[in-house]
Amino acid sequence: MKKIIIALLLIAGTATMEAQNTVWETNVDVATKLALKKKKPLLLFFTGSDWCGWCIRLQKEVLKTPEFEAWAKDNVVLVELDFPRRTPQQPEIQQQNAQLQQMFQVRGYPTIWFAEPTKKDGKVNLNQLGSSGYVAGGPAKWLEGANQILANKK
């Protein structure tokens, strides 16, 4: 019985570690370089992580699921653009997030924009592909919409 409990704890610990392997960049410059290198679009997640109920719900129901994490690994570079009320944030990140919020005309949370970075004459542009937000129905329903947005870029 002890061996079974220990084995279950090890399996649960491994599953938790695997779920935490998803990397969300907070610096858009770093994410853009990575996206250009990997030839993948950016997924820009505009969120209020410590106050926005719909943002927290989207994370729980979609963004922190194994289905989403597997899809994201193959399809996008993840960027979290947070607008917290209680959590301190570096001034550079606050400024970057505010500029991107204005650039993408984000008016509510959560908002997710898909953008394709392109580089021309040493300058990087973010071409908007489409946006999403909270979609009821779990990861399958949300990913269906995301795949439609990404299919339109081709």
Predicted stretch roles:
Residues 55-73:
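Typically the conserved alpha-helix immediately C-terminal to a functionally engaged Cys/Sec
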Residues 38-52:
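Short active-site neighborhood of thiol/selenol oxidoreductases, capturing the structured segment around
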Residues 15-21:
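Sec/Tat signal peptide C-region and signal peptidase I cleavage site
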Residues 49-52, 83-88, 107, 119-121:
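Solvent-exposed loop/turn segments at secondary-structure junctions
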Residues 22-26, 68-95:
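Thiol-based oxidoreductase modules, predominantly thioredoxin-like and allied folds used
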Residues 24-42, 72:
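A short beta-strand-turn-helix
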Residues 61-63, 99-154:
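Non-catalytic, surface beta->alpha helical segment in thiol-disulfide oxidoreductase systems
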Residues 4-13:
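Sec-dependent N-terminal signal peptides
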